[in-house]
Design a protein with these regions (language model features):
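A cross-family phosphate/adenosyl-ligand binding-site feature
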Residues: 1-187
């Protein structure tokens, strides 16, 4: 567990390909860069990572509980205050909900509130395919997030888009680019 010399990084993962590598691809390298990490997952991502044992590994690594459900109003906050949020991977559904202000689970509530908090950086990596990107609402969703000050890690140089089910097998998410965007957002 890190002492968090750089502060607390709120890592939020959604049910998209690559979430299974959240620990090794994003959390461990963030700790190596000096962050204390607090992990929150969407309900489906939480279910997936509990089944694989990753939630337990993340909790052991970070020393904090992994959140995927809301707490009761009288319960203590399980995570310290966050200095920057990073949403990776962000499914097309999560991007659409964040862009339109829908906050129907713990992960969306935390990030949605962060987008409206002055001075709190938010970085989002949309893990989408070419069909998602051609949807008529997609560009507006990205523009809406950017207008809210969100640092969007997106483009062919970062994540080339493929048609559904045509991406090369074993393709890793651009974790280094995501962490570099966190560094840039927190300077």
């Amino acid at each position: 567990m890190s002492s968090g010399k750089r502060g607390v990084l709120g890592v939020v993962g959604s049910a998209a390909g690559g979430v299974e590598a959240l620990r090794t691809g994003l959390v461990e390298p963030a700790i190596d860069r000096g962050w204390q990490v607090a992990v929150t997952l969407t309900p489906t991502a939480g279910h997936w990572l509990r089944l694989s044992g990753e939630v337990e590994r993340l909790e052991k690594l970070t020393g904090l509980p992994v959140r995927d459900e809301p707490r009761l109003p009288g319960d203590a906050r399980p995570h310290p205050p966050v200095d920057c949020y990073v949403v990776a991977p962000a499914s097309a559904n999560m991007v659409a909900k964040l862009a339109t202000g829908l906050m129907d689970n713990q992960a969306l509530t935390q990030v949605g509130e962060a987008i409206g908090t002055l001075g709190l950086p938010v970085v989002v990596f949309p893990r989408v395919n070419a069909a998602h990107a051609r949807h008529p609402a997609w560009r507006r969703h990205l523009d809406s997030l950017k207008a809210g000050g969100v640092h969007v890690v997106y483009g062919p140089d970062v994540w080339p888009l493929y048609e559904p089910r045509e991406a090369p097998a074993g393709r890793e998410l651009p974790w280094v680019a995501v962490l570099d965007a966190v560094d840039e957002a927190t300077r």
